[in-house]
Amino acid sequence: MSNLCRNIKVFFKVFLYRFKQNKLNQAAGYLTYSTTLALVPLIMVFFSVFAAFPVFNEITGELKQFIFTNFAPSTGDAVGEYIDQFVNNSKQMSAVGIISLIVVALMLIHSIDRTLNSIWLDTSVRPAIFSFAIYWLILTLGPIVIATSIGISTYVTKFATYTFEQDLGLSVGIKLLSLMPFFLTWFIFTVLYMVVPNKKVSIIHSAAGALIAAVFFTLGKQAFTWYITTFPSYQLIYGAMATLPIMLLWIQLSWTAVLLGAQLSAVLADMRSLDDSNIQIEKMKEEK
């Protein structure tokens, strides 16, 4: 019991120290700025990839709804109009304009890569060609993976909901299905924490950090939506420009949740290293 309390105390000390060391608030602000610049290019690339695969035409609506509810709570209608405008405008762009947008999107991925690796205290640098290949795969395959996951979850939800409706005694199952977006978010964060760092990250540590990030992300989304709908004074202040500060604030909160989860995963790895070191020390003492 004493060892457990000691480990918990050490964990929180290490977590707070690393939080200050990595300046997560500043890092979240930096990623918010990068995301704002790359938002339009990312949307353009995502939906351009979907357009290249007719199989995803049926879930485009579900994908937009996923973006609205998770990344733009309470401003879904306005963001939906912007997305349609972005996609339509991208069809009229020149090759130079498209390349420029792709470069901006790749720069965001690079920013995420560098920020997460700094949390794991990894200062190694990949070869430029290797990094470009990884970023390009993320930019092109990422939308396909996300669309496939959303499509599967949507299909399972609809099928299971229909099945449960045939049996009133299984109403609990319908409530469990409402957690599908949460599990999808948890899965995406887990993959993010495993794939992006240059160091090998345990799936247990990644899943633990991703779980906390998904919880904060989901609770933050609900609290943010409640505040926006309950205290709409921001509309009186900003008027037609209200969507912009709302988006910026939500992006900031989202990145804070993501970085906190990453920090938790990294600290768990640090704690494991400390435990291994203590075991080695004890063995050396016993041998003496």
UniProtKB/Swiss-Prot annotation:
The chain crosses the membrane at residues 36-56, 92-112, 127-147, 176-196, 200-220, 240-260. NCBIfam families: PRK01637.1, yihY_not_rbn. This is UPF0761 membrane protein HSM_1104. GO terms for cellular component: plasma membrane. InterPro entries: UPF0761_bac (IPR023679), Virul_fac_BrkB (IPR017039). It comes from Histophilus somni (strain 2336). Keywords: Cell inner membrane, Cell membrane, Membrane, Transmembrane, Transmembrane helix. Signal peptide: none annotated. Belongs to the UPF0761 family. It is a multi-pass membrane protein. Pfam families: Virul_fac_BrkB (PF03631). Its main location: membrane. The lineage of its organism: Bacteria, Pseudomonadati, Pseudomonadota, Gammaproteobacteria, Pasteurellales. It is found in: Cell inner membrane.
